[in-house]
């Protein structure tokens, strides 16, 4: 998997101070996309174990509340295994920190993926420049923010906000 940028101490992509990973590669090609340079899967740099270690180190700061994964498209078949591995490792080391993930897919299309065990918040839906929004953390009004919640018996549900 390639990535475009690792942004430490990001306050724009999720609640609190976060480490943000922008992956490369996206087939959605949304009109008006703010990150068109990330569409090519070979754009940016190859993500390595050293990058994962760097993310883990950055997240050790008490000011950091979690990891945000954006794109490109994190849930594309070419990215999903590495994204799952990153999320699993982060949750193993920092179970109290949240993972936010942006995708052009709808949550119901990807809800059974292994990565969803580790993700706490999903912003889903393709960017649509004809539908401006004032909703936080979304680029267009058709996008949804889903928050994982656990019932008293430990069952997991996704609640739209």
Feature map (PLM): residue ranges:
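P-loop/Walker A phosphate-binding loop and immediately adjacent motor/lid segment at beta-alpha junctions
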Residues: 77-83, 87-91, 132-161
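Non-cysteine beta-strand/loop elements that form the S-adenosyl-L-methionine
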Residues: 119-128
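Conserved Radical SAM active-site core
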Residues: 1-7, 17, 35-100, 107-112
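Short Gly/Pro-enriched loop/turn and capping motifs at secondary-structure junctions
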Residues: 105-108, 127-130
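A generic structural signal for alpha->beta connector loops
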Residues: 96, 118-119, 142
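N-terminal pre-triad scaffold of radical SAM enzymes
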Residues: 2-29
């Amino acid at each position: 998997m390639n990535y475009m940028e690792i942004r430490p101490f990001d306050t724009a992509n999720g609640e609190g101070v976060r480490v943000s990973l922008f992956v490369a590669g996206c087939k959605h090609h949304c009109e008006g996309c703010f990150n068109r340079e990330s569409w090519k899967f070979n754009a940016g740099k190859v993500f390595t174990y050293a990058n994962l270690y760097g993310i883990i180190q950055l997240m050790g700061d008490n000011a950091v509340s979690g990891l945000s994964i954006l794109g490109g498209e994190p849930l594309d078949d070419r990215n999903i295994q590495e994204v799952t591995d990153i999320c699993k490792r982060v949750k193993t080391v920092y179970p109290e920190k949240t993972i936010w993930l942006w995708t052009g897919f709808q949550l119901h299309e990807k809800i059974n993926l292994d990565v969803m065990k580790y993700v706490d918040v999903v912003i889903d839906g393709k960017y649509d420049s004809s539908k401006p929004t004032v909703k936080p953390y979304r680029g267009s009004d058709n996008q949804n923010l889903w928050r994982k919640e656990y019932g008293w018996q430990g069952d997991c549900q996704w609640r739209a906000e």
